Amino acid sequence: DPANEDIAYHILDMYRDAGGEHLVHRIMEEKRTAGTTMMTVVHHRETPLRIADGAADVGPVWATEIHHARSLGLPIDEVQPGATLDQRDRINYFICRLKTALHPENAQKFLEFILSSAAQAVYARYGFIPHRA
């Protein structure tokens, strides 16, 4: 749901690239009105569970959520969107230390870790584009 998650704008771009404004309208207006497009607050957690319990047939999620769903034994399949629809190179993650962090030393350690080659290897293993300095 674009009202709750910025990632929805990238998903809408993918729909648009796949089928134009007609597809966006079909999914986000017609099917939403009919109750067959379900909005989410935390799509990457809600969507795999909806698929597993039969409330949904398909939905966009992070690659890590496919892994997580499988680790829980959920019967879920993965479909890659393909290079022309892939949005990974357009998405940014922001990690920062709060000025009022209760444990600023731990925040700093996490920031140092997330920039490390070990952490970047984890990102790459799950199909994410590693951090660019």
Model-derived features with residue positions:
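Exported/periplasmic ABC-transporter solute-binding proteins
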Residues: D1-A133
